[in-house]
Amino acid sequence: MIFQIGIENNNEGYRSITWALEHPGCFSYGSNAETALTALPVAISDYADWIGLHEPSWVLGDQVELHVADTWTDYYIDKHFDRLPGSDYYLVDAWFQYDWKPLTGIDIERGDKLLAWSRADLLGVVQRLSATKLDQAYPGERWTINGILKHVSNAERWYMDRIGYPVNTNKNDVLENSFMRLEAIRKHFLDVLPRLEGLQKTIGVDGEFWSPRKVLRRALWHERDHTEHIRKLIGR
């Protein structure tokens, strides 16, 4: 099976991500493009198996042919949209040629399923944790687990705002309880998703390009990434 790949370098200033562009939620990391690309076949196999837990997988992960379609290097800009080195400024993340493509009906149908499975995985990891564990601080970590959950929902809210579908409340007003916040913002996301089918919409916001396809790609990556993040914290 042929996979169209996007390579994103300098992600968060220190790593590379390889994205299976036709399969949101499928990605791998590395210290550079080469190591990230080397890790991708295993990530594709795991992704196919993950889908297969729920229904016959539409991804064939045993015969993988990678075609690098696009490469991007993240960079920082200031409020004047000038590129500057250093992490004190806004980091512009990857915009691939593939992100221009409007979402199809199949993309929407599969995206809805992937979002449901990803959310079930996240909740399966955290739902039985005590309040103490949810609010436990971890050395070297920016957030508690509760903080990560709020970050996941706030990011999803932010993604939708990028393409002109904001949640109609202030971020701090969207339910203090992290589980209720996750549910409320995801409901908005799922309500909007069918309206994005076939929509030829690309918006530049704060120096970065966004489209419905990029939003779906980023939302699934972000939740799956932080689900693994939380698993690692619990295992400490």
Labelled PLM ranges:
Residues 101-128, 174-203, 210, 214-222:
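Acidic/histidine-rich alpha-helical segments that form the ligand environment
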Residues 43, 71-72, 85-86, 185, ...:
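A general marker of short, structured functional hotspots
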Residues 13-20, 86-98, 198-199:
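Short alpha-helical hairpin
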Residues 3-33, 37-56, 60-67, 75-78, ...:
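Short, contiguous alpha-helical
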Residues 1-3, 10, 77, 87-89, ...:
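Generic detector of short, locally flexible boundary/turn motifs and exposed helical patches
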